[in-house]
């Protein structure tokens, strides 16, 4: 009984499993939509980084360092915290360069 559908019911596309060969084909030719999504995500990242730099130039520097560290933590840069701990002289502006 399990895995059977009532008469005339066609499961939506996302519930049907793809044949392995089809999977391979789909991997080889990525659809345009995913490419566009990736590009827009990259653009968003770039915008965020630029915004951070502008904040550094415009506002008072003490407040800026705190802001930048918060932003960096959101973007998932684990090295930044460790690096600043080891080298206190490292400017927080350059945290964005760390992985």
From Swiss-Prot:
The keyword Repeat applies. Keywords: Repeat. The keyword Repeat applies. This is Duplicate procyclin. It comes from Trypanosoma brucei brucei.
């Amino acid at each position: 009984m399990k895995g059977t559908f009532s008469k005339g019911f066609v499961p939506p596309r996302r519930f049907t499993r793809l044949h392995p060969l089809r999977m391979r084909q789909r991997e080889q030719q990525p659809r345009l939509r995913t490419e566009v999504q990736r590009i827009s995500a990259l653009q968003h990242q770039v915008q965020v980084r630029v915004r951070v730099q502008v904040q550094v130039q415009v506002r008072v520097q003490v407040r800026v360092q705190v802001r930048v560290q918060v932003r960096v933590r959101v973007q998932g840069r684990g090295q930044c915290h460790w690096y600043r701990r080891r080298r206190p002289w490292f400017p927080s502006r350059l945290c964005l360069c760390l992985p």
